[in-house]
UniProtKB/Swiss-Prot annotation:
ATP binds at G79, P80, E81, S82, S83, G84, K85, T86. GO terms for molecular function: ATP binding; ATP hydrolysis activity; ATP-dependent DNA damage sensor activity; damaged DNA binding; single-stranded DNA binding. It comes from the Bacteria. The keyword Secreted does not apply. GO terms for cellular component: cytosol. InterPro entries: AAA+_ATPase, DNA_recomb/repair_RecA, DNA_recomb/repair_RecA_CS, P-loop_NTPase, RecA-like_C, RecA-like_N, RecA_ATP-bd, RecA_C_sf. This is Protein RecA. The gene is recA. Its main location: cytoplasm. Coiled coil: none annotated. It comes from Streptococcus pyogenes serotype M3 (strain ATCC BAA-595 / MGAS315). Can catalyze the hydrolysis of ATP in the presence of single-stranded DNA, the ATP-dependent uptake of single-stranded DNA by duplex DNA, and the ATP-dependent hybridization of homologous single-stranded DNAs. It interacts with LexA causing its activation and leading to its autocatalytic cleavage. It is found in: Cytoplasm. GO terms for biological process: DNA recombination; DNA repair; SOS response.
C-alpha cells in the first residue's frame, strides 16, 4: 500500500513538473512574440495599488474613495446643461498640470472659454487644444495623443458633439440610426487598452437626452450608445441644486450654485457616494469652502456659534471670513487639507509627515537665503 502511494506521488510530481515546464516554455514564447510583461503572475506586479490623480476637489476625492481619478482608466462626467461638467473637468486639467503632467482638451463643442479655464488654474499656454471637424477626427486625435504615452490627461468635451462624418456630409433630416453609437463602440475598443498601458486618464464629458414614451423609471439617458457606460471605470452625475446669493452689494445677485456630484459607477472603490461643492461663477469649485465644511464636520476646525477656530486660534466669524482667511494663508490651508485626507485614509501618516517636512525645508531655505542677503527672483 505504501509503495503504491509513493508511486502515485512520483507520477503526480512528474506530471506536475512537465506541466510547469510546458507553462514556462509557453510564457517564454509569448514574451518573445509580444514583449516582456505580456503575461505575468498578478503577485509579480510591482504596483498593485491603483494609482490616482487628485480631481482638484477635496470633496470629490473623498467621494471617489481612492483619492482621485484612477490612472489608466476612462471617466465619464454627465449631467444637465450648465450643471458644471466642464468646470469639474477643467479642475482635473489644472491638477494634472500642477503635478507636472501634460493635458489635452478635445473641444468638440467649440465652446471652451480660455479666460475661464485660466481662472480655474489651467495654464492655457501649455494646454493642448483641438477643435475637430468631425467625431472620427476628434477620437483619432485623442487616440494618437494617448498612444504617444506623453500625455497624462485627455478631456473630450463632449460625446454628444462628436458628430460622425457621414452625418456632417449628409443633409439635415437624413436618418443615421446608430451611427454615433457604432463610432463610440469602435473607439472604446481601440482606446481602452492604450489608455491602460500608458496610464492616461481619459475624461469624456456627456450630455443628457430623454427617452421617448417612458412611463416608469428614469427617462434620462446619455447619447453615444452603451459602450462608454461599460468601458468607464468611473461615472459622475453632476447636478446643480440651489443658487448661492452674494453678500453686501451683491445680496440680490447670484454668485454661484451648490452642486452635487454623485459617483454612480466606480470600479476602484464603493460607488454611490456624493460630493457637495460650491461652484462660484468665474472661479470654479470653492476649495476653501469645501475644506471649511468638511474640516468642521470632522472637528479639525472647531465651530463655536458663528466663529471658526483652528488649534485655539480664531480664523474668522462666519464661513465667508474663514474661507477668506484660508485663502490668504495657503500653508495653513495645506496643513488642514492633509489632516482631512489622513482622516479619510486618502493619505498615509508617513506621507503627511513627509509633505510637511518638505514644506518646512522650503520655508527654512527661503529664510536662510534672506538672512544671507541672496536676491530672490520673483
Amino acid at each position: 500500500m505504501a509503495k503504491k502511494l509513493k508511486k502515485n506521488e512520483e507520477i503526480t510530481k512528474k506530471f506536475g513538473d512537465e506541466r510547469r515546464k510546458a507553462l514556462d516554455d509557453a510564457l517564454k514564447n509569448i514574451e518573445k512574440d509580444f514583449g516582456k510583461g505580456a503575461v505575468m503572475r498578478l503577485g509579480e506586479r510591482a504596483e498593485q495599488k491603483v494609482q490616482v490623480m487628485s480631481s482638484g476637489s477635496l470633496a470629490l476625492d473623498i467621494a471617489l474613495g481612492a483619492g482621485g481619478y484612477p490612472k489608466g482608466r476612462i471617466i465619464e462626467i454627465y449631467g444637465p446643461e450648465s450643471s458644471g461638467k466642464t468646470t469639474v473637468a477643467l479642475h482635473a486639467v489644472a491638477q494634472a498640470q500642477k503635478e507636472g503632467g501634460i493635458a489635452a482638451f478635445i473641444d468638440a463643442e467649440h465652446a471652451l472659454d480660455p479666460a475661464y479655464a485660466a481662472a480655474l488654474g489651467v495654464n492655457i499656454d501649455e494646454l493642448l487644444l483641438s477643435q475637430p471637424d468631425s467625431g472620427e477626427q476628434g477620437l483619432e486625435i485623442a487616440g494618437k495623443l494617448i498612444d504617444s504615452g506623453a500625455v497624462d490627461l485627455v478631456v473630450v468635451d463632449s460625446v454628444a458633439a462628436l458628430v460622425p462624418r457621414a452625418e456632417i456630409d449628409g443633409d439635415i433630416g437624413d436618418s443615421h440610426v446608430g451611427l454615433q453609437a457604432r463610432m463610440m463602440s469602435q473607439a472604446m475598443r481601440k482606446l481602452s487598452a492604450s489608455i491602460n498601458k500608458t496610464k492616461t486618464i481619459a475624461i469624456f464629458i456627456n450630455q443628457l437626452r430623454e427617452k421617448v414614451g417612458v412611463m416608469f423609471g428614469n427617462p434620462e439617458t446619455t447619447p453615444g450608445g452603451r459602450a462608454l457606460k461599460f468601458y468607464a471605470s468611473v461615472r459622475l452625475d453632476v447636478r446643480g441644486t440651489t443658487q448661492i446669493k452674494g453678500t453686501g452689494d451683491q445680496k440680490d445677485s447670484s454668485i454661484g450654485k451648490e452642486t452635487k456630484i454623485k459617483v454612480v459607477k466606480n470600479k476602484v472603490a464603493p460607488p454611490f457616494k456624493v460630493a457637495e461643492v460650491e461652484i462660484m461663477y468665474g472661479e470654479g469649485i470653492s476649495r476653501t469652502g469645501e475644506l471649511v465644511k468638511i474640516a468642521s464636520d470632522l472637528d479639525i476646525i472647531q465651530k463655536a456659534g458663528a466663529w471658526f477656530s483652528y488649534n485655539g486660534e480664531k480664523i474668522g466669524q462666519g464661513s465667508e471670513n474663514a474661507k477668506r482667511y484660508l485663502a490668504d494663508h495657503p500653508q495653513l490651508f495645506d496643513e488642514i487639507d492633509r489632516k482631512v485626507r489622513v482622516k479619510f485614509g486618502l493619505l498615509e501618516e508617513s506621507e503627511e509627515e513627509s509633505a510637511m517636512a518638505v514644506a518646512s525645508e522650503e520655508t527654512d531655505d527661503l529664510a536662510l537665503d534672506l538672512d544671507n542677503g541672496i536676491e530672490i527672483e520673483d
